A protein has these predicted regions:
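N-terminal pro-sequences and low-complexity stem/linker regions of secreted or lumenal proteins
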Residues: 1-140
Length: 140
């Protein structure tokens, strides 16, 4: 578990069997998603989304997103991380090549709740932060 290691609990990232850790995490996320999709709320008429993002990159790149060069002081992104969006009423199999970062996800959530004063870098449209709208499209 990230951040919970100590004298008697090994740091997962330093463990010898990383493949087993990946399998354990994958199985856990699979069970969690299945349990959420089994709820009445998920099966209802309201629009729901599950967002899965993994932000523990290998740290081998400072390459950011949103037209910011890697060595620029304004680079607030870094690395390539996967994000999966599962919606209950949206189209399936959508991929989006737009580069996003954590602020884009925050911006998307704020927009969904009608919050127009965005927090921190989520407001940085001039630096390329855009909502992830294509991944949350809802079919009529």
């Amino acid at each position: 578990m990230h951040g919970l290691h100590g004298p008697t609990i090994p740091a997962d990232c330093d463990g010898a069997d990383k493949a087993a850790l990946i399998r354990r995490g994958d199985a856990y996320v699979g069970r969690l998603v299945a349990s959420l999709q089994a709820t009445a709320a998920w099966k209802g008429t309201g629009n729901m989304a599950i967002v899965i993002t993994f932000d523990e990159g290998a740290g081998k790149t400072r390459e950011g997103c949103c037209a910011v060069t890697p060595d620029a002081p304004s680079n607030f992104g870094g690395g390539h991380i996967p994000t999966i969006v599962i919606t209950n009423h949206g189209p399936r199999g959508v991929t989006d090549e737009t580069p996003y970062n954590h602020y884009a996800l925050l911006r998307t959530i704020e927009d969904a709740f009608g919050i127009s004063e965005h927090l921190g870098h989520a407001a940085d449209s001039d630096r390329g932060v855009r909502p992830m709208s294509a991944l949350f499209a809802v079919e009529p």
